[in-house]
Curated annotation (Swiss-Prot):
Family as reported in the entry's similarity comment: Belongs to the herpesviridae BBRF1 family.
Highest taxon in the source lineage: Viruses
InterPro entries: Herpes_BBRF1 (IPR006878)
Organism: Saimiriine herpesvirus 2 (strain 11)
Protein name: Uncharacterized gene 49 protein
Length: 303
């Protein structure tokens, strides 16, 4: 009786599910090198490894494609979050702070480009904190809401500083924190018990302004990534390696005189059809073929 096939688990696939929108190609390359699949029949380990590497790359490629397809929707949602917490600020404040929040809300709702909105938020959001705490808060020199801007403008996060810096200090040209990662940071801001202190004593203001700062930073990073199509470098790199592994498996089939194996031939054709414009659904049939061949090689007990 053949043993059931148990898919191997790879940390990068988990990271792309939980923590990253995309990662630098060097990270993909590093884990790819360590992918291997040993079989009971020694001579089948090489083709099985080609399939395992292909399966690993295919999963990475599908996740990246899904993330790319979601980018505009993510930007819309993040902008909605910014507006929500600005409204929370407006409801909780009065006087000059409330008036300034109203002005910001009006500008945010205008038809600005993503870049224009990011620059505007970077300039105007810190002014609210200066109005609220004029003797204790100084505006940082950053003119865009990047990671340094974010860490400077968040109030009372000392106990969670490392959690925030691990996400917001990424360079969007190479890697980007996921929606889930930013949502976890947002949750930490709700839980943060150091808001109430002598320097920044207004809990309602601190809580809302921190959320505005965090989501403004995420909006900036995702707008840069979306505008520059940063994720496509990772997709292109992964796609090229995937084609190589599928081709190597097909060459093995030919060497073993399996040229009549029509599914292997079609599998190579399907891989060759993948382009930078492909979607995750375009790869689904390939996933089924790779999985099927892996099971066959793993379950072989004799040459």
């Amino acid at each position: 009786m053949s043993r059931p096939y148990q898919p191997q688990r790879y940390s990068l696939i988990s990271e792309l599910h939980k923590n990253f929108h995309y990662v630098d190609v060097s990270v993909i390359q590093s884990e790819f090198k360590n992918v291997i699949l040993k079989t009971v029949v020694p001579k089948l380990s090489q083709p099985a490894t080609h399939l395992e590497k292909g399966d690993f790359l295919l999963k990475i490629c599908q996740l990246l494609m899904i993330h790319r397809e979601e980018e505009q929707q993510i930007l819309n949602k993040v902008k909605s979050n910014i507006i929500y917490f600005l409204n929370e600020l407006w409801s909780a404040e009065y006087g000059k702070v409330q008036e300034q929040v109203k002005n910001i809300l009006c500008e945010v709702k205008l038809d600005k480009t993503d870049s224009e909105l990011s620059t505007y938020l970077a300039q105007e959001i810190p002014k609210l904190t200066v109005l609220k705490y004029p003797t204790h808060f100084k505006v940082c020199e950053e003119t865009i809401p990047n990671g340094r801007w974010c860490l400077h403008n968040l109030l009372g996060i000392e106990q969670y500083y490392k959690d925030f810096s691990n996400i917001v200090l990424h360079d969007p040209e190479t890697s980007l924190g996921s929606v889930q990662a930013y949502s976890r940071l947002s949750k930490l801001l709700f839980w943060c018990d150091s808001f109430m202190n002598k320097i920044y004593p207004c809990n309602a203001f601190n809580s809302s302004i921190n959320q505005v700062v965090l989501w403004s930073t995420m909006f900036h990073f995702y707008s840069v990534a979306h505008c520059n199509d940063c994720i496509s470098e990772s997709i292109s790199f992964t796609e090229a390696l995937l084609k190589q592994e599928v081709s190597a498996f097909y060459e093995w089939c030919l060497e073993e005189e399996y040229e009549e194996d029509r599914m292997a031939k079609f599998m190579k054709f399907s891989a060759d059809q993948i382009t930078i414009l492909s979607t995750h659904t375009d790869l689904q049939n390939l996933a089924e073929y790779i999985y099927s061949y892996k099971k066959c090689l793993i379950n072989r007990r004799f040459e």
